[in-house]
């Protein structure tokens, strides 16, 4: 990776771009193929494709509000994204695990931010459920990238705290 010292770990932004592109392509595909709330069962009693629009935050938090939440969540995503870019830029060469985690979170945040700004809602299409009795809120690839990145960040902090020094690499 050229000029890592000058650009920190910014070369890892290719992961951010990949997450963003795959997220947007998958959302476009499911919007073209499914009608609202239509389900295509992939694994009976466990996993389906569906189409849902979320005007709130994760797990539809504040989805029933009057619309102000769109701008609040967009502002939060912009601020968090800027912080993540600065954090990525300041990482040292051996902090690969952390760079990947931050790039995943950033890609997911930007994917959902794009939806929120352009469409006014986030497009969700993955539905995990159990025998028509329990349904996890629908989500998308951006949400998945944010979750994986956040778990990686938590593991990184746990490993760092346990050993007493940064556990990157």
From Swiss-Prot:
It comes from Pseudomonas aeruginosa (strain UCBPP-PA14). GO terms for molecular function: aspartic-type endopeptidase activity. InterPro entries: Peptidase_A8. This is Lipoprotein signal peptidase. GO terms for biological process: proteolysis. One of its GO terms (cellular component) is plasma membrane. The keyword Flavoprotein does not apply. Keywords: Aspartyl protease, Cell inner membrane, Cell membrane, Hydrolase, Membrane, Protease, Transmembrane, Transmembrane helix. It is a multi-pass membrane protein. Pathway: Protein modification; lipoprotein biosynthesis (signal peptide cleavage). The active site is at residues 124, 143. This protein specifically catalyzes the removal of signal peptides from prolipoproteins. It catalyses: Release of signal peptides from bacterial membrane prolipoproteins. Hydrolyzes -Xaa-Yaa-Zaa-|-(S,diacylglyceryl)Cys-, in which Xaa is hydrophobic (preferably Leu), and Yaa (Ala or Ser) and Zaa (Gly or Ala) have small, neutral side chains. Its EC number is 3.4.23.36. It is found in: Cell inner membrane. Belongs to the peptidase A8 family. The chain crosses the membrane at residues 10-30, 40-60, 68-88, 94-114, 135-155.
């Amino acid at each position: 990776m050229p000029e890592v010292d000058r650009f920190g770990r910014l070369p890892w932004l290719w992961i951010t771009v990949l997450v963003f592109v795959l997220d947007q392509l998958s959302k476009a595909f499911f919007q073209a193929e499914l009608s609202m709330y239509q389900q295509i069962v992939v694994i009976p009693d466990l996993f389906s494709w569906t189409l849902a629009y979320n005007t709130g935050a994760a797990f539809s938090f504040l989805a029933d509000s009057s619309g102000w939440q769109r701008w609040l969540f967009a502002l939060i995503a912009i601020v968090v994204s800027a912080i993540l870019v600065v954090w990525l830029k300041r990482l040292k060469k051996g902090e690969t695990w952390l760079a990947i985690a931050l790039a995943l979170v950033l890609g997911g945040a930007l994917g959902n931010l794009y939806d929120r700004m352009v469409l006014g809602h986030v497009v969700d299409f993955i539905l995990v459920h159990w025998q028509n009795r329990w349904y996890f809120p629908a989500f998308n690839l951006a949400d998945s990238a944010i979750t994986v990145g956040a778990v990686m960040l938590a593991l990184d902090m746990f490993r760092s705290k346990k050993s007493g020094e940064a556990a990157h690499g």
